[in-house]
């Protein structure tokens, strides 16, 4: 009987299920979007029950579409939007509040208060690898416990559970039998110590989070539990791989070696560099995070998180309405010779790496009477590449060695104008893989390795092939001139939302 691996890819805007075979061919894909909830300015939520409903329905749908039963599934791998925080009742399984999404800035005030505490900023940097920011799960958990009536009392009694989205899905798939996360997701919470690989006692104390709420932290590739996808008493399918979306993409790009770099152009942009077993402390505003955890050992990575990448294209379409489809951007961007001196800094929810300014806001600078919509579309696209260059420069500065190329994936990597401009701007080769579903593929690899579907990383590396390569076509002088102007535009956006 032919066996397959199913990857559940739970993203910021949609839930997807993808079936892969042993040669990493995609056999089937199902996807459902779900609601984005914006209760106030800067707040972003999801309904956890809708996350679960859409994720489970696409799993059933893709199996039906491909005429595959649970007997054909060797294992399930899960990859997920990271940092997004869910707290639910251990006994009823009902979430006590909506999921607070990674983009949500509601805990900026909590972060400001924590920054006043003696030595805490440095402690967080040193032990969690992160910066003190509203982006991570820790302050989101605190907010829920402090603001949902009765939550803190229930948490103290051991009646509440916290999980990132992976934990929530595993808990639901196993009917509440398994409460786990993996090293990669734990490393994004700001309450996990990436040196001793344990939940950090001081951080739990500082944020007043009971340890009983927390999931057990496991390898990124092992059997965590079993999902029963059919009628009661049917075949139980092992859930055998978990990784946060960006780490899954790094693994799916076969970036197994020290110095390998990938950039995912999704809602945000996420540049990761594998630093092997070396925990590199960033001097440049990057995060030190766990790349993957296998066999009780971890590899580390440097990460630059850009909050608004492909989301700037959605903004052009949904808010400005100057394009009707995301794919139109490439056409309009090439209708003008250059950006006409226009720079878009899409700091809609603040600036991520390497600036970390929660109070920055979006700006468009350099407008003249001659500016038309094509200039704005082009400048918006270019902003994705500029932010990537900022992060890459910081990375190279931190590790002290250069890189040869960037492996790319994510929706916006389909835009050839953007990929060529990216190569021009960083002066490096940009390589697109044949399989661009690298996030789901990474989760599939992790699950497959745990059950012996693939034997080892070497077998996987042989399956990775490039589909397109982009080489730089402009001079260093020109790329630096462009970048200097961009930096000037960034300065204009900083601190905008601060009260006078």
UniProtKB/Swiss-Prot annotation:
For the ligand (sn-glycerol 3-phosphate), the binding residues are 12, 82-83, 135, 245
Provide GO CC annotations from the record. cytosol
Pathway-wise, it operates in:
Polyol metabolism; glycerol degradation via glycerol kinase pathway; sn-glycerol 3-phosphate from glycerol: step 1/1
Q: Name one GO molecular function term.
A: glycerol kinase activity
- The protein's Enzyme Commission number: 2.7.1.30
Q: Which key words are in the record?
A: ATP-binding, Glycerol metabolism, Kinase, Nucleotide-binding, Transferase
Protein name stated in the entry: Glycerol kinase
Which organism does this sequence originate in? Clostridium perfringens (strain ATCC 13124 / DSM 756 / JCM 1290 / NCIMB 6125 / NCTC 8237 / Type A)
């Amino acid at each position: 009987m032919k066996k397959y691996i199913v990857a559940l890819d739970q993203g910021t805007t949609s839930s997807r299920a993808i079936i892969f075979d042993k040669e990493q061919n995609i056999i089937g894909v199902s996807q459902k979007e779900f609601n984005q909830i914006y209760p106030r300015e800067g707040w972003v939520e999801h309904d956890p029950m809708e996350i679960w409903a859409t994720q489970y329905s696409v799993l059933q749908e893709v199996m039906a579409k491909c005429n595959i039963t649970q007997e054909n599934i060797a294992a399930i791998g899960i990859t997920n939007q990271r940092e997004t925080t869910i707290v639910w009742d251990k006994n009823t399984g009902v979430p006590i509040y909506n999921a607070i999404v990674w983009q949500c800035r509601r805990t900026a005030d909590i972060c400001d208060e924590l920054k006043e505490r003696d030595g805490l900023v440095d402690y967080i940097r040193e032990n969690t690898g992160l910066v003190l920011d509203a982006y991570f799960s820790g302050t989101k958990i605190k907010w829920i416990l402090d603001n949902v009536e009765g939550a803190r009392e229930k948490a103290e009694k051991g009646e509440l559970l916290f999980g990132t989205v992976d934990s929530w899905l595993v808990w639901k798939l196993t009917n509440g039998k398994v409460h786990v996360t993996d090293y990669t997701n734990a490393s994004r919470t700001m309450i996990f110590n990436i040196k001793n690989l344990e939940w950090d006692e001081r951080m739990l104390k500082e944020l007043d989070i009971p340890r009983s709420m927390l999931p057990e932290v496991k390898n990124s590739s092992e059997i965590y539990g079993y999902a029963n996808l059919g009628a009661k008493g049917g075949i139980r399918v092992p859930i055998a791989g978990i990784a946060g979306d960006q780490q899954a993409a790094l693994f799916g790009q076969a970036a197994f070696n020290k110095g390998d770099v990938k950039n995912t152009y999704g809602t945000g942009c996420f540049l990761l560099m594998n630093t092997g077993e070396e925990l590199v402390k960033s001097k440049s505003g990057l995060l030190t995070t766990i790349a993957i955890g296998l066999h009780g050992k971890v590899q580390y990575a440097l990460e630059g998180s850009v909050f608004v990448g492909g989301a700037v294209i959605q903004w052009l379409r949904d808010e400005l309405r100057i394009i009707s489809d995301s794919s139109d951007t490439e056409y309009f961007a090439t209708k003008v010779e250059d950006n006409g001196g226009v720079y878009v800094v899409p700091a809609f929810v603040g600036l991520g790496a390497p600036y970390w300014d929660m109070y920055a806001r979006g700006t468009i600078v350099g407008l003249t009477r001659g500016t038309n919509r094509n200039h704005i579309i082009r400048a918006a696209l270019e902003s994705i590449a500029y932010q990537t260059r900022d992060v890459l420069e910081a990375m190279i500065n931190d590790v002290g060695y250069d890189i040869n190329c960037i492996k790319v994936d994510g929706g916006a990597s389909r835009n050839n104008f953007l990929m060529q401009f990216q190569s021009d701007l960083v002066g490096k080769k940009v390589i697109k893989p044949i399989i661009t579903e690298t996030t789901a593929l990474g989760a599939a690899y992790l699950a497959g390795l745990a059950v012996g579907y693939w034997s080892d990383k070497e077998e996987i590396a042989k399956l990775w092939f490039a589909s397109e390569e982009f080489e730089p076509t402009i001079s260093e002088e020109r790329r630096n001139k462009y970048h200097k102007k961009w930096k000037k535009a960034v300065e204009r956006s900083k601190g905008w939302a601060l009260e006078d």
